[in-house]
């Protein structure tokens, strides 16, 4: 049962990461000033 809980946690974490990646991509496309620094870092991370 504990192993099953870990699998769910990992899946949820991965989904959250994917959603964050999508949000960053949208923000970067719109060239939001606040996200410029994050976008520069984001380009080096292969999503």
UniProtKB/Swiss-Prot annotation:
May form homooligomers. Probably interacts with the periplasmic domain of PhoQ. GO terms for cellular component: plasma membrane. The chain crosses the membrane at residues 6-26. It comes from Citrobacter koseri (strain ATCC BAA-895 / CDC 4225-83 / SGSC4696). It is a single-pass membrane protein. Pfam families: MgrB. One of its GO terms (biological process) is negative regulation of phosphorelay signal transduction system. It comes from the Bacteria. Keywords: Cell inner membrane, Cell membrane, Membrane, Transmembrane, Transmembrane helix. PhoP-regulated transcription is redox-sensitive, being activated when the periplasm becomes more reducing. MgrB acts between DsbA/DsbB and PhoP/PhoQ in this pathway. Represses PhoP/PhoQ signaling, possibly by binding to the periplasmic domain of PhoQ, altering its activity and that of downstream effector PhoP. InterPro entries: MgrB. It is found in: Cell inner membrane. Signal peptide: none annotated. Belongs to the MgrB family. This is PhoP/PhoQ regulator MgrB.
């Amino acid at each position: 049962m504990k192993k099953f809980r870990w699998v769910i946690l990992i899946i949820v974490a991965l989904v959250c990461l994917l959603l964050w990646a999508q949000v960053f991509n949208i923000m970067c496309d719109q060239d939001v000033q606040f996200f410029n620094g994050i976008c520069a870092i984001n380009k080096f991370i292969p999503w």
